């Protein structure tokens, strides 16, 4: 496919059908990787706590997310290097360490994603959770057994993303939230300082750790690199964040429509109780569809992105990306089936994940000013400043996640 996307002249850019398919694939891979089981729970819990004012946190987090995403995607495509390769050029060995940490974090998170998919199938069909997890793993593995695994991954990510958006949009419509009030508080929240933690949490969950590299590495794997592709990269990066933002906004409004009536969400499963209160007993089954789609897409995104970091560790791994993905999914599934969800491991992985983005984005911002890495490309100053803000916000994310680790001991 990479050959099909080469341009006749490097100075020109023509948006073709192949570019459109790849744009949608990279956008939905990044967006659906971010929309996992934790995304659903976070949005429901914060909405029930802050009501209409949570709209402000969503808006600000989207702006910061774009700052992080557009910096990373542009520099990666200009240089043709992955995140870990650029990090190694800035600080020798840094990229290797990051790759290992991302692999550890991705494996731990995939245990949670596999479990979430099992719970989703349980809610839809009444299947045993472990059987549901095993079926999810088999389905994910079948995608990557094919030589066209990455193309199939693009299509599956798009389908799962569209299903989630349509289902949540329906629940939002039924719950009938106060749209006008939410719009006003998007720009004029009550007690804005209380929204600092939600904003930091949302940014960490949307572009933290491996997630922001999912789409960019997918683009590189398709053979796209060079300054001539920057218009395409800008569209992809912003569209990815906006897609995640749309899903979060729809879910926020759906939850808002329920909690403003005085309903208290279930502490065990807040998002599921939203669906049940909005559309009745069938809400549990409908939520299962959303949970399965969110978890399944995150299984694919996490395993694929972790593989793109690991395959540069040694030449022998470079042509075995699909095999790495399959091994990744098998190991995480086996751990869940025979051990369960190791909570302490997930907390530690979350803390590590919280530090990956500020370190890697920091290295990429440094690289953007080095001619030895980016050549004659001039990175816009406003983007650089945007990136610095994203680094500072994600450092705060890392501090909060590290505190959770300290509570384990």
Which residues fall in each region the model found?
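Membrane-interface "cap" regions at the ends of multi-pass membrane proteins
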Residues: 1-40, 195-199, 225-228, 239
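Membrane-interface loop-to-helix entry segments
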Residues: 117, 131, 136, 146-175, ...
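Extracellular/periplasmic helix-exit of transmembrane alpha-helices
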Residues: 67-75, 221, 241-272
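Transmembrane-helix boundary/entry motifs in multi-pass membrane transporters
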Residues: 12-20, 51, 77-107, 123-127, ...
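Transmembrane alpha-helical segments of multi-pass small-molecule transport proteins
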Residues: 27, 96-100, 123-146, 162-169, ...
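Hydrophobic alpha-helical segments and their helix-loop junctions in multi-pass secondary transporters
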Residues: 161-190, 199-217, 363-373, 397-409
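Extracellular loop-to-transmembrane helix junctions
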Residues: 45-70, 87-88, 93-94, 197, ...
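Hydrophobic transmembrane alpha-helices that form the core helical bundles
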Residues: 95-126, 133-135, 292-312, 342-348, ...
């Amino acid at each position: 496919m990479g050959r099909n996307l080469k341009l006749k002249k490097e100075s020109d850019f023509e948006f073709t059908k192949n570019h459109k398919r790849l744009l949608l694939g990279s956008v939905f891979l990044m967006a659906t990787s971010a929309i996992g089981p934790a995304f659903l729970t976070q949005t429901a819990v914060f909405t029930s706590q802050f009501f209409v004012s949570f709209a402000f946190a969503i808006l600000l987090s989207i702006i910061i997310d774009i700052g992080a995403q557009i910096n990373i995607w542009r520099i990666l495509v200009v240089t043709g290097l992955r995140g870990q390769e650029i990090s190694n050029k800035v600080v020798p060995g840094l990229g290797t360490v990051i790759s290992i940490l991302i692999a550890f974090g991705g494996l731990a998170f995939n245990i949670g994603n596999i479990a979430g998919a099992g719970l989703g199938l349980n809610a839809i069909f009444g299947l045993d959770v472990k059987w549901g997890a095993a079926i999810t793993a088999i389905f994910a593995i079948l995608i990557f057994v094919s030589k066209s695994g990455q193309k199939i991954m693009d299509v599956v990510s798009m389908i799962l993303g569209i299903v989630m958006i349509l289902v949540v949009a329906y629940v939002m419509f039924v719950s009938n939230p106060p749209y006008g009030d939410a719009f006003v508080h998007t720009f004029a929240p009550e007690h804005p300082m209380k929204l600092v933690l939600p904003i930091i949490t949302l940014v960490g969950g949307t572009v933290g750790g491996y997630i922001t590299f999912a789409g960019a590495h997918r683009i590189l794997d398709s053979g796209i690199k060079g300054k001539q592709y920057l218009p395409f990269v800008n569209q992809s990066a912003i569209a990815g964040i906006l897609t995640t933002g749309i899903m979060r906004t729809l879910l926020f409004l759906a939850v808002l429509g329920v909690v403003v009536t005085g309903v208290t969400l279930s502490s065990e499963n807040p998002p599921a109780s939203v669906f049940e209160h909005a559309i009745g007993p069938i809400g549990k089954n409908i939520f299962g569809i959303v949970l399965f789609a969110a978890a399944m897409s995150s299984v694919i995104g996490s395993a694929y992105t972790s593989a793109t970091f690991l395959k540069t560790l040694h030449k022998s791994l470079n042509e075995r990306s699909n095999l790495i993905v399959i091994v990744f999914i098998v190991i995480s599934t086996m751990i869940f089936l025979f051990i369960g969800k190791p909570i302490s491991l997930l907390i530690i992985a979350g803390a590590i994940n919280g530090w990956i983005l500020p370190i890697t984005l920091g290295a990429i911002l440094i690289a953007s000013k080095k001619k030895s890495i980016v050549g004659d490309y001039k990175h816009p100053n406003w983007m650089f400043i945007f990136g610095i803000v994203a680094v500072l916000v994600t450092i705060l994310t890392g501090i909060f996640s590290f505190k959770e680790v300290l509570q384990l001991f």
